[in-house]
Design a protein with these regions (language model features):
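A short beta-sheet element
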Residues: 37-38, 56-117, 234, 259-319, ...
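Hydrophobic pocket-lining residues within nucleotide cofactor-binding pockets
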Residues: 41, 142, 238, 301, ...
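Non-catalytic DNA-recognition/assembly elements of restriction-modification systems
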Residues: 1-20, 144-217, 354-361, 365-401, ...
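Short, well-ordered beta-strand elements within core beta-sheets of diverse protein domains
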Residues: 99-103, 144-149, 156, 195, ...
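Short coil/turn segments at secondary-structure boundaries
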Residues: 22-30, 50, 127-128, 190, ...
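Sequence-specific dsDNA recognition surfaces
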Residues: 6-26, 39-69, 89, 94, ...
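A short glycine-rich beta-alpha junction/loop motif
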Residues: 2, 91-99, 107-110, 122, ...
């Protein structure tokens, strides 16, 4: 832990402020400066669906909430603490009701975004929410957050690992969109199209190609803080916009059916959303390696079991085709949104031939597996850190007493060099 130091977030930031707070209904225009809201902020990436725009004049009038590449945007309400870095391809933007963090030279923006999106960061934010009716992450609290910060070089290594994961997932998404959304699949030049659908493709209910398994209902006393109990995949196991969120895993001691077990590579979908933003309901994730026993799915989750469809293609379709944006509109509820699982297999979908499904699977599956492997290694290191850090800070464990073996890439340069 050499070089680590205790800091407040404001001490390593150029500034920490809040996005515009006020009525926006009469400010939106068809084209102009991108205007980000909470629903556009997903873990580690922006979601451009339902992106709003404001005129340049209003953008200049609310200078405090201007964003630039490298800023970290953090959600205040709904899913507080969710964070992403403003990318280089968004040179000019503004926002409402977000915490804006502009890192100083000692803080890697991708590292601090990873901290906020981790189970540690979510717990830290969750313990500092304010408000009675709707809790939110206050900017004053954000400035005073205390963290133990590694040297910039170590931050960069950690951040680069997360960016490799994002890149692999983005590559798989781009291949899917190129082939099955833009219809530039291999052989498309010779294909005959009818009403936008290539000949040989079919429009069928999704249930023709997969079936749905509903999760297990449970009582609060069935959830236990005991790793020996069964891992339990709940609504908390989903990132905003889809994908698996490791920090949300629970443990369960109750009964379940064998079909409610999921294992590595299985596809699950959230059928509940705790907010009205609809950024979790209808979203899919792939189950990572959770051990030989697998995990049980809760009532907020369904399992989609492939029948006549390639499993990797099915996952890509559910994540990246726009199906989630379609199905989420069927969810209803005053405070908590619920989506009836039986509606999902009833939806008509465009299904390409199996040969084309298999072909994209051969390309995308290794990318997804590598991303999952990197994420799992990162989770294991985080678990070790979370277990050791309190003892190191308290002095109960000395760093010089640890036999830590570093890989060659992390070895410090020799004095001779």
């Amino acid at each position: 832990m050499n070089g680590w130091r205790d800091i407040k977030l404001k001490e390593v930031s150029e500034y920490v402020t809040v996005g515009f707070v006020g009525s926006m209904a009469d400010q939106y225009v068809e084209a102009g400066v991108p205007f980000l809201r909470s629903l556009n902020i997903h873990p580690f990436r922006l979601n451009y669906n339902d992106l709003k725009y404001i005129p340049e004049s209003f953008h200049d009038a609310i200078k405090k909430s201007k964003l630039r590449p490298g800023d970290v945007a953090i959600v205040r309400t709904g899913y507080p603490g969710t964070a992403c870095v403003i990318p280089a391809d968004l040179p000019d933007a503004n926002c409402s009701d977000l915490v804006i963090l502009r890192p100083g030279p000692d803080l890697n923006p991708h590292y601090i975004a990873a901290v906020f999106n981790s189970s540690f960061g979510q717990s830290l934010v969750g313990g500092n929410l304010v408000g009675a009716a709707q809790q939110h992450f206050n900017v004053t609290v954000a400035k005073e957050l205390k963290l133990r910060l590694p040297p910039r070089a170590e931050q960069d290594k950690i951040a680069n690992n997360q960016r490799r994961i994002d890149l692999l997932e983005s590559m798989a998404e781009e291949i899917y969109r190129e082939w099955f959304v833009r219809m530039r699949f291999p052989g498309c030049e010779a294909a005959t199209f009818s009403k936008g659908i290539p000949e040989g493709w079919e429009v069928v209910p999704l249930g023709r190609h997969c079936h749905v398994v509903k999760g297990r209902s449970y009582a609060s006393e069935d959830l236990v803080d005991d790793p020996a109990a069964m891992p339990f995949v709940t609504l908390k196991s989903f990132n905003r916009g889809g994908g698996y969120r490791a920090g949300g895993l629970k443990h369960y001691k109750g009964e379940f059916k064998s079909e409610q077990l999921v294992k590595q590579g299985d596809i699950v979908m959230a059928v509940t959303d705790m907010t009205q933003d609809r950024v979790v309901v209808g979203r899919a994730a792939r189950v990572p390696d959770l051990g030989e026993r697998g995990a049980v799915i809760s009532l907020d989750v369904i399992r989609l079991v492939p029948k006549k469809v390639d499993p990797t293609y099915l996952y890509l379709f559910l994540r990246f085709s726009g199906f989630a944006n379609h199905i989420k509109e069927f969810a209803n509820g005053a405070n908590v949104l619920h989506l009836k699982p039986d509606l999902i297999p009833a939806q008509d979908v465009v299904m390409p031939p199996r040969a084309l499904q298999d072909r994209v699977s051969l390309i995308a599956e290794p990318m997804l597996q590598q991303a999952e492997k990197l994420a799992q290694n990162s989770r294991r290191l985080s678990e070790m850190r979370d277990a050791l850090l309190p003892r190191l800070i308290s002095g109960k464990l000395r760093v010089d007493a640890l036999n830590i073996q570093f890989p060659p890439s992390m070895q410090p340069p020799s004095e001779a060099a």
